[in-house]
């Protein structure tokens, strides 16, 4: 078994070994998934603005941590996008991202309210832990599935960052002075956040990343169609261990035992669902 390198925080684009790129090892479905992921990651500034509204008045350190998180997320999108541009010269990150931003902006990004749409700062951090659980497992799966050396490196670097981001939000969650939420309330927040991604974010990012502007008239956006295509492209990289790690991280954020019956049951159900979705 090959042991993945350990990547430290603070890398930049020049640290990636771009010269090792091997076009013969680019897998089309994985390329399509990476293009879509690049757009989602590149959209971090809007999330930063929203989170800074939610945590207004919480201190300089919190604001600085959110800004650093946003810079790292944006760099993830830039690295994935550059790799995709090398693998497919027809892909242009900035153009695809402009289309994505024009058609996808969650309502709470532009709302004037300062509170969280999750009802509290604790709820917001649970939602963020859910996202970071998903991204850390996803990029770990891409790292393990890819034979292309540069993508393997990029995915490994991003996965390491996402685990650190999970810890940031988990620690922020537990630092809040607000009353704790009940388990079922936390679970509803987690499920709602997953459904938000299932609605349009993943499907529309896949569409904008993989359908060229000149192809739009013949291929109009259909959420169900492109959600299915996005699922086929991305879900095939997972092994059961990636899903179980994801579930354990979510369960931990909910305040339950990450190695208990709930984690085992949820892991089995999620694996079954994803296996069916990628079939």
Task: For each feature predicted by the language model, list its residue ranges.
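Non-heme di-metal
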Residues: 1-279
């Amino acid at each position: 078994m090959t042991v993945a390198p350990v990547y430290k925080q603070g890398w930049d684009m020049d640290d990636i070994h771009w010269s090792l790129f091997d076009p013969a090892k680019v897998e089309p479905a994985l390329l399509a998934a990476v293009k879509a992921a690049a757009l989602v990651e590149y959209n971090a500034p809007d999330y930063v603005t929203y989170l800074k509204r939610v945590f207004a008045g919480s201190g300089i350190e919190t604001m600085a941590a959110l800004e650093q998180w946003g810079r790292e997320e944006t760099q993830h999108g830039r690295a994935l996008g550059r790799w995709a541009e090398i693998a497919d010269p027809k892909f242009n990150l900035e153009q695809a991202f402009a289309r994505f931003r024009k058609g996808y902006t969650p309502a709470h990004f532009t709302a004037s309210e300062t509170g969280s749409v999750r009802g509290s700062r604790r709820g917001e951090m649970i939602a963020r832990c859910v996202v970071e659980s998903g991204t850390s497992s996803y990029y770990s799966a891409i790292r393990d599935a890819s034979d292309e050396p540069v993508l393997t490196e990029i995915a490994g670097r991003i996965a390491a960052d996402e685990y650190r981001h999970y810890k940031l939000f988990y620690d922020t969650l537990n630092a809040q002075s607000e009353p704790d939420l009940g388990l079922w309330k936390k679970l509803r927040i987690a499920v709602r956040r997953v459904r938000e991604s299932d609605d349009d974010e993943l499907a529309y990012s896949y569409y904008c990343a993989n359908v060229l502007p000149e192809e739009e008239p013949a291929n109009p956006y259909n959420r169900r169609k492109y959600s299915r295509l996005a699922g086929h492209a991305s879900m095939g990289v997972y092994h059961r261990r990636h899903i179980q790690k994801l579930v354990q991280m979510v369960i931990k954020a909910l305040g339950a035992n990450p190695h208990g019956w709930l984690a085992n049951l949820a892991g089995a159900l999620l694996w079954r669902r994803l296996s069916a979705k990628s079939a």
